[in-house]
Regions:
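Fold-level signature of zinc-dependent metallopeptidase catalytic domains
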Residues: 1-30, 109
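Short, solvent-exposed beta-strand edge segments and adjacent coil->beta transition regions
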Residues: 3, 133-135, 212
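Second-shell loop/turn segments in exported
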Residues: 9-19, 89, 145-147, 221-222
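Solvent-exposed, flexible loop/coil residues
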Residues: 12, 21, 77, 125-127, ...
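Stable alpha-helical elements in mature extracytoplasmic
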Residues: 18-25, 152-156, 230-233
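Metzincin-family zinc-dependent endopeptidase catalytic domain
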Residues: 27-192, 196-197
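Metalloprotease/metallohydrolase-associated module, dominated by Zn2+-dependent proteases
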Residues: 183-235
Length: 235
């Protein structure tokens, strides 16, 4: 079980999402990681054999760093919520060796990206790296499926995968990959929901692009699985 703390960094009250929306996001995250998501039946037959229950669960922490009871939801008003990046982590953070910190913001701007194009981000774990690279930063409208949430919550599922060590399946195109033999090679990020896509033919047997994979960029309603090899990396 991964103890979670959610830091809501809001500029205006419209960004200050409810506890209920936060809890809904964690419920959806657990459904995806335990393969209890309602859309498992959408996994194409060619991939059903490698679709995994990751046996990882996320839980809002019961105790804060001082040992006091907590909802594990904090609220901080700050203009840094707009065009946020690692700067919001300096506002509030709980020890990253005990908690997964999730910062919920209005919008995200990373160097090299246009304002508003990034839905969320996280870094793969790297021993010795600074806490600047810890945790997940995510837009409030990608958090949960109620309230201001506008999707099925898969941005959080995807970013938690990075936090637990996963790469994109399209990393390095057809010939490098994500160190998971059961994710077919894919040339570039998948967008939309193209079940006919097969951008790499160097795999044997030649399988279509796994647009169902949470670590690609297909639409939320296309994503529905992690694989056995991805599970092994995360655990």
């Amino acid at each position: 079980t991964v103890p979670v703390v959610v830091h809501i960094i809001y500029d205006t009250q419209s960004d200050n999402i409810s506890d209920k929306q936060v809890r809904d996001a964690i419920i959806g995250l657990n459904e995806d990681y335990r393969r209890l998501n309602a859309d498992t039946s959408n996994t194409r037959s060619i991939f059903q054999g490698v679709a995994a229950d990751c046996e990882i669960e996320f839980q809002l922490a019961k105790l804060d760093p001082q040992g006091n009871c907590t909802t594990a939801i904090t609220r901080t008003q700050s203009a840094l919520s707009v065009g946020a990046n690692n700067n919001v982590k300096g506002l509030i953070s709980w020890p990253n060796n005990k908690y997964l910190n999730i910062w919920v913001v209005n919008s995200i701007t990373l160097s090299g990206s246009g304002t508003g194009t990034v839905l969320g981000y996280a870094y793969k774990p790297n021993p010795g790296q600074s806490t600047t690279y810890d945790g997940i930063v995510i837009r409030h409208d990608r958090m949960g499926r109620i309230g201001t949430g506008t999707s099925m919550g898969r941005t959080l599922t995807h970013e938690a995968g990075h936090y637990l060590g996963l790469d994109h399946p399209f990393k390095g195109g057809c010939f490098a990959g994500d160190n998971c033999a059961d994710t077919p090679p894919v040339l570039e990020a998948s967008y939309g929901c193209n079940t006919n896509a097969n951008t790499c033919s160097n795999d044997s047997p030649n399988k279509p692009d796994m647009i169902e994979n949470y670590m690609d960029y297909a639409d939320d309603n296309c994503m529905n699985l992690f694989t056995d090899d991805q599970r092994a990396i995360m655990r």
